[in-house]
Structures are given as structure tokens and as C-alpha cells.
Amino acid sequence: MSDQVEIDLFEEWFEGEFDNWGQASSNPTSWAHIFVKHEKIDDHKFLTSSRYNYEPNKPYREQVVEVTEPVVLGAQVSIIIVKNPACDMIFSYIESEKMFLGHSCEGCMWKDKPLESKARLYKDKYHTWDKGYWQGSEGFFHFDKSYK
């Protein structure tokens, strides 16, 4: 896949609103119902926000992230870096699974605590796992893309 096709695909899948209603409703003691929104605000820049369902107009986390052009790092042929104020994320396209697999760079900190993040981005799903500041002992959040 060419670099431009890869970045276009990543941004198409990344943009939108996601929620984990299925996960939260099946196990409400372990999973809060959360909305995650990635809104394109400029070429390769997104305003990202996370909100609880009971405060839909009050994000608890909001930031601007920038998607960079794919680069070559070590054994990985092509990766996309999401520049994030908390911690940069590195994504690689896994063609056999039709997904982008992401992880945080080493040494990330959020509010003076270590942070390790993992993500899987599919056409209609976004799975995230933050360990450290938010604990993350239950595993991945499973967000489904909303089409309105």
C-alpha cells in the first residue's frame, strides 16, 4: 500500500465518534460508558475528546493530535506516528488483520505517572488500553464507530 493510501485509510478510520455501549452495558461494574470523538480540524490534525455518557457535553480529556506521514523505523517498513501531547503513538498497518496496531513510545508520562498505551484501529472499531495513570487492569476498551 502506498504511503498516501495508508495515511488516507488511517485518517478515514480514525475520524468519527466511537462508544463502548456494548461493553459497558454487559459489565457496568468494570466499564464506564464512554464516547470518544476524533474530529478533523485541519490537514492531518484532529481534536480528540473523551466523555462519559452522563456528561456528554463535558470532556474529561481533550487534545489536538497530529498524524504524520508514514516513516521507516527499524524492522517496521511503514508506520504512522500520532503526535499526542501526552504520549506519541506509533501505528503500523497489519494487512492480514485489516487493522492498524498502535503502541505508545517508551518513557511516556501523564501527570507525573508512567503511561503505556496500546490501540487497535479497524474500519468500524477502535480498541484502546491505557496502563499506568488510569490503571487499565481490565484490558482493552472496545469502542464501536457510530454512524448517524
Predicted regions: what they are:
Residues M1-E6:
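Basic/polar N-terminal segments that are highly enriched at the extreme N-terminus
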Residues I7, W21-P28, Y54-K148:
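Calycin-type beta-barrel ligand-binding domains and close structural analogs
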Residues I7-L9, E15-D43:
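Short, solvent-exposed loop/hinge segments that bridge or flank secondary-structure elements
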Residues E17-W21, L47-S49, F100:
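Short Pro/Gly-enriched beta-strand edge/turn motifs at strand-loop
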Residues V36-E62:
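N-terminal glycine/threonine-rich, aromatic-flanked beta-hairpin/loop signature
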